[in-house]
């Protein structure tokens, strides 16, 4: 790997020669592969090496073809870089009661799915990505994870300024120069320049300034990057503390994890450097906004309600249906957790929402057609529909959105599963089963290549 001479000069100066030499040695090795399990759908494999700072994170001995695993598509686990799982320590040490949280730069969904697993019960997570295609991927991953207390938006950061004091916790995994991903991303190596670093610093501060009013006084900000330089890391944290008015917070960590403390100044911050930690480059700091007040409690806007007949039928499709209120957006019926009903309606009204709560069904020709998000949800009442177990080849055919034959299955809507994990829905009409898997999510790779 040939690195830019200015990058080498700057990083040696920051790391010191001994740490830099160990870092360069690690860059010549293959990246580690890690996953994080969704324990609402699948037990973590305890035969695998654990990611020490994440309860359900595991290292894999080699990289399999994830696309060929039906459980990957069912949301049973997420392929995530191990270092970035460190956000779990922030939640465990500073979030002890339900919160309203924002993952501002959330695509493709690693931190979002992690937060959906570890935030205290009763929390609401808003995940945002302004780029349309990346936002679609984010929504797909959030839906597959199956937590109904989730909203996905596609807004620019400045749009959140209108939601004053709306969030207890904001995570900004900021766009950065990507130095920490050099081992995995040759494009990041080629594109690196001091000028790009300077542009990233400017953009990061704009993002933080624009979203600051949305964090309540006393709320917690998590700032992270996947880069090494001080300008985007320690210097930016110092700027947040001084210019925006925030108190940096320390985390309790184990020495054996190999996490490196801040390399500049005395502000608490945490660096993951290949050669010292098993993962890619990562930086994280935690700050508390000055002051103290509760999050804003919005008044619920008016919303269209589904008729009683519709509501009664869909209630049978849910576990604990009494915990939800229902709204109708066009022909789509959505369940919203009662505790977040007002907040979710405000978001639907003010923001560019791609996904909200639990979409349950579409109304077509006066009939209710269950939608894929219901099949993915942990709130699904699995006894509401017949379940058909598929062999691996059948499961992959379904995920390619091919027409299936289910001669032994009852007619009507059925749940399709692989090894107990629900993959989605199909409508069995006897001689064939109409595939209801979302067309935009289908596997595009040729089956012979899997």
Regions found by a protein language model. Give the residues of each.
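Mobile active-site "lid"/loop adjacent to the S-adenosyl-L-methionine
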Residues: 133, 168-209, 226-233, 255-258
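S-adenosyl-L-methionine
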Residues: 128-165
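Class I S-adenosyl-L-methionine
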Residues: 167, 220-223, 228-334
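Polybasic, low-complexity RNA-engagement segments
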Residues: 1-42, 280, 290-450
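Conserved SAM-binding loop of SAM-dependent methyltransferases across substrates and taxa
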Residues: 108-121
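Helix-to-beta-strand junctions that scaffold the AdoMet/dcAdoMet cofactor pocket
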Residues: 120, 215-217
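Conserved class I S-adenosyl-L-methionine
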Residues: 97-107
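Conserved AdoMet
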Residues: 31-89
């Amino acid at each position: 790997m040939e690195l830019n001479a200015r990058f080498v000069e700057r990083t040696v100066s920051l790391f010191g020669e001994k740490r830099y030499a160990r870092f360069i040695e690690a860059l010549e090795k293959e990246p580690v592969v890690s996953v994080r399990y969704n324990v609402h759908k699948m037990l973590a494999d305890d035969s695998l090496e654990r990611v020490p700072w994440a309860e359900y994170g595991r290292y894999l001995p080699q990289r399999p073809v994830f696309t060929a695993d039906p459980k990957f598509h069912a949301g049973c686990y997420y392929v995530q870089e191990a270092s970035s799982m460190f956000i779990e320590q922030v939640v465990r040490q500073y979030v002890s009661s339900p919160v309203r949280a924002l993952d501002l730069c959330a695509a493709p969904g690693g931190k979002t799915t992690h937060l959906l697993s570890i935030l205290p019960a009763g929390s609401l997570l808003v995940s945002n990505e302004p780029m349309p295609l990346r936002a679609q991927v984010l929504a797909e991953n959030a839906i597959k994870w199956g937590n109904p207390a989730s909203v996905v938006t596609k807004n620019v950061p400045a749009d959140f300024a209108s939601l004053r004091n709306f969030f207890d916790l904001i995570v900004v995994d900021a766009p950065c120069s990507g130095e920490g991903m050099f081992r995995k991303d040759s494009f990041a190596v080629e594109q690196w320049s001091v000028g790009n670093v300077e542009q990233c610093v400017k953009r990061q501060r704009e993002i933080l300034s624009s979203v600051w009013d949305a964090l309540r006084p006393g709320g917690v900000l998590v700032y992270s990057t996947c880069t090494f330089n001080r300008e985007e890391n320690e210097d930016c944290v110092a700027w947040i503390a001084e210019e925006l008015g925030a108190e940096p917070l320390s985390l309790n960590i184990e020495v054996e994890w190999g996490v490196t403390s801040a390399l500049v100044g005395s502000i608490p911050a945490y660096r993951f450097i290949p050669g010292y930690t098993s993962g890619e480059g990562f930086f994280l700091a935690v700050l508390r906004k000055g002051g103290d007040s509760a999050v804003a409690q919005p008044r619920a806007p008016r919303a269209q309600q589904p008729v009683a007949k519709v509501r009664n039928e869909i209630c049978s499709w849910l576990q604990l249906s009494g915990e939800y209120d229902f709204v109708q957006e066009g022909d789509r019926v959505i369940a919203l957790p009662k505790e977040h009903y007002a907040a979710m309606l405000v978001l639907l009204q003010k923001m560019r929402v791609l996904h909200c709560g639990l979409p349950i069904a579409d109304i077509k020709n006066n009939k209710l057609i269950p939608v894929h998000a219901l099949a993915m949800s942990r709130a699904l009442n699995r006894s509401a529909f017949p379940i058909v177990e598929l062999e691996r080849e059948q499961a992959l055919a379904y995920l390619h959105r091919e027409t299936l034959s289910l001669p032994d299955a009852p007619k009507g809507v059925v749940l399709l599963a692989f090894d107990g994990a629900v993959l989605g829905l199909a409508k069995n009409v006897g001689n064939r089963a109409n595939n209801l898997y979302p067309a935009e999510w289908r596997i595009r790779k040729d089956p012979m290549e899997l």
